[in-house]
A protein has these predicted regions:
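Hydrophobic alpha-helical transmembrane segments of multi-pass integral membrane proteins
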Residues: 10-21
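Auxiliary, metal-adjacent structural segments of Zn-dependent hydrolase domains
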Residues: 65-137, 141
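Cytosolic-side transmembrane helix boundary signature
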Residues: 1-12
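Membrane-interface segments at or immediately adjacent to transmembrane helices
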Residues: 25-93, 97
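Active-site recognition of the HExxH zinc-binding catalytic motif
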Residues: 146-165, 169-170
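Active-site/pore-lining binding-face segments in mid-to-C-terminal subdomains
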Residues: 165-217
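Second-shell loop/turn segments in exported
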Residues: 39-46, 77-81, 134-138, 149-156, ...
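Pan-zinc metallopeptidase signature
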Residues: 215-273
Length: 273
């Protein structure tokens, strides 16, 4: 009887482990997106990074001009988040013709109690047990479309955060909805500018001067949103997430988010010459 009693939790644990391995466990060690996409990642100068930053900021400025705003002049999505989830899936799957490994049958799932995710400093999370791409829809609207596409990248098998960010950027560019394109370019510009600031503050100042007032409002609002959730709980969550990423083959941990910039540089290298 005791052996039979023990067999139940053992069976449950085995099933959970099997789900983790089949739905997630091997994906962090698959071929990188850079390898299968044909993009050549290489060292780049600060001037090359500036060119990408300037291009992205100018694109963001242009896209932002006619987008809806709230009463504070901050970007606001015009559609219901469930309609945006449909658009995210459509835009993501349109990448399949160019990148054959990108496709999913799933859709992003707006989370009902999203503010809890904000307290944990989480904008989205892929659940390998339910095979769901969960998205925080309490955060600023500017990040919701690109986060939806980011989580679909995980659903498609790309678990590295840097690659998922870049794939999400590509998916947003595919959309016919300017709100999606703006969201993708916004995220890319933030990552690129953060990288530029670490290598050349003068070039960063030159690029920063290009930002429109509307883009600045969105950046300030987004920063203020996350600032209010900087608590001991979010710090613990960051440490757990860092350990989680390292345990799954992302040796740079949370810093691997910054590696998206290398893919951006590779993507724009020929386009900006």
């Amino acid at each position: 009887y005791f052996v039979r009693l023990l067999s139940v939790p053992v069976l449950i644990a085995t099933c959970i482990a099997l789900l983790c391995v089949t739905n997630y466990g091997t994906n962090p060690r698959r071929y990188s997106f850079a390898a299968v996409s044909g993009l050549t990642v290489q060292e780049s100068s600060a001037e090359e990074l500036y060119d990408v930053c300037a291009y992205l900021i100018n694109e963001a400025n242009t896209l932002r001009e006619n987008l809806p705003e709230d009463e504070n002049g901050v970007f606001q999505l015009s559609n219901d988040v469930f309609l945006d989830a449909d658009e995210a899936k459509s835009s993501f799957n349109s990448l399949h013709d160019t990148y054959s490994t990108l496709y999913t049958n799933g859709k992003p799932k707006p989370v009902l109690f999203s503010e809890v995710m904000s307290y944990l400093d989480i904008s989205g999370i892929y659940c390998p047990f339910t095979f769901e791409a969960n998205v925080n829809v309490h955060m600023n609207d500017v990040l919701i479309p690109v986060t939806m596409c980011h989580e679909l990248s995980h659903l498609s098998g790309y678990m590295r955060e840097d690659e998922a960010n870049f794939i999400a950027f590509l998916a947003c560019l595919q959309s016919d909805d300017p709100e999606f394109r703006y969201s993708g370019v916004y995220l890319a510009s933030v990552h690129a500018m953060n990288a530029l600031l670490t290598v050349d503050s003068d070039l960063w100042n030159r690029a920063d001067a290009l930002k429109s007032d509307a883009l600045r409002r969105d950046i300030r609002s987004n920063n203020a949103y996350w600032k209010q959730y900087e608590t001991p709980v979010s710090e613990v969550s960051d440490r757990v997430n860092d350990a989680y990423l390292k345990a799954n083959g992302q040796e740079n941990g949370l810093r691997s988010y910054g590696r998206m910039v290398d893919l951006l540089l590779a993507y724009y290298r020929d386009k900006l010459q």
